[in-house]
Amino acid sequence: MKKATVGAVVVGTAAAVAVAALIMRHRMGKSSKWARARAILKEFEEKCATPDGKLKQVADAMTVEMHAGLASEGGSKLKMLISYVDNLPTGDEGGVFYALDLGGTNFRVLRVQLGGKDGGIIHQEFAEASIPPNLMVGTSEALFDYIAAELAKFVAEEGEEFHPPPGRQRELGFTFSFPIMQTSINSGTLIRWTKGFSIDDTVGKDVVAELTKAMQKREIDMRVSALVNDTVGTLAGGRFTNKDVSIAVILGTGTNAAYVERAQAIPKWHGPLPKSGEMVINMEWGNFRSSHLPLTEYDHAMDTNSLNPGEQIFEKICSGMYLGEILRRVLLRMAEEAGIFGEEVPPKLKNSFILRTPEMSAMHHDTSSDLRVVGDKLKDILEISNSSLKTRRLVVELCNIVATRGARLAAAGILGIIKKMGKDTPRESGPEKIVVAMDGGLYEHYTEYSKCLENTLVELLGKEMATSIVFKHANDGSGIGAALLAASNSVYVEDK
């Protein structure tokens, strides 16, 4: 009896020790996994670091590439396209002008009424239409005929107060967001289609001539006064209300910048010098690349798997299309190596681009004590229903690292433009005002990003220059901006 009791006690003690060891091992396993997650975060943070010294190197590299791109075609990663816009709006324009904005599967037609000197925009309205899929792969004639038909409908429905005086044509600004080789303010040949369009017989043709032909067929008495890109349109929209606007930056799905350059500082410009002495340059800065950019293994992997490997590197670390995807890639590694979402890797986390930047922004801005928004987003998008508060905090930290790097690099890019314009040091007469027209959903809606960008540029310019920089939100460059460029490049401008 005694032996049995002793045996039972021994077995019981051994079992208790085994359970305790298991619990201990589990705890140690959890803590070592958490240490791994923190190590991945720390390494990522270090590789994304953007100290002021590095940002100044990026800005200098941007300036060097700008010089090279202005010197010759193909001389730089930056295309530095001549926009042929040498007359930006002054705010004195008056009359009724139109815009056609073709940027993807939808297009818009706008009518804008301007009030003349200090009158601003009196009236604006627009109509939107989607392009049937068969016309995206059909013929040039069919596509432009469809667009002209919608334009005709829009004009037919307008009130008499918008009719032009006898003998005067309506004037239109045409925003065409596809790669073109611009040949004048109102002509340009299509280089290639993107965004799901594939109409071979338009390639190499002047898109303004194609639209004009279609408008004549529909008996629309309208001329295209300006063929523009949305970034140049943003610059025009900003200048209309503020004469100090000289730079425009779009930070949305993609990113681009345009600025006002002295015509004499463009060696590749062989035409007559414009009366204004100025020319707007469309930088196409998304393609900027430099050894100073802080790229990580996640960026390289994302680039390799993209449709355009090796291209648009700056865009891939700064713009809305990609920030959420970078976050997803880091979270996936943490899930695989540190089990931050449990033993199994959530299957949805393996889907490229499932985590969009608006969702990342919502998580980054979550101020609730239990980070409820983060929990909801993880559950709704990735089907992760049991995230711990510790893990949610980790997610917010990652959002901050990704957004901060992007915003600070965008600020460095703007500093590069300011340097190229020679406005980065104070003049004897005091600092010159630099107004940057900003547009795009990323800038407009991701507050932490835009706040970081603005603070960084002020920091980089230094105290003396900090008061000279102003950011202005200029909405709808591709619509209103195009109509304003039609106004400032009107053939009737001398008649007013």
UniProtKB/Swiss-Prot annotation:
Belongs to the hexokinase family. PROSITE patterns: HEXOKINASE_1, HEXOKINASE_2. Pathway: Carbohydrate metabolism; hexose metabolism; Carbohydrate degradation; glycolysis; D-glyceraldehyde 3-phosphate and glycerone phosphate from D-glucose: step 1/4. Residues 35-487 form the Hexokinase domain. The keyword Transferase applies. D-glucose binds at residues 194-195, 229-230, 256, 284, 315. It is an enzyme of class 2 (transferase). One of its GO terms (molecular function) is ATP binding. Keywords: ATP-binding, Chloroplast, Glycolysis, Kinase, Membrane, Nucleotide-binding, Plastid, Plastid outer membrane, Transferase, Transmembrane, Transmembrane helix. Its EC number is 2.7.1.1. One of its GO terms (biological process) is glycolytic process. It catalyses: a D-hexose + ATP = a D-hexose 6-phosphate + ADP + H(+); D-fructose + ATP = D-fructose 6-phosphate + ADP + H(+); D-glucose + ATP = D-glucose 6-phosphate + ADP + H(+). This is Hexokinase-2. Fructose and glucose phosphorylating enzyme. May be involved in the phosphorylation of glucose during the export from plastids to cytosol. Seems neither to be involved in cell sugar sensing nor in carbohydrate metabolism in tuber. ADP binds at residues 104-106, 253, 441. The gene is HXK2. Residues 90-228 are annotated as: Hexokinase small subdomain.
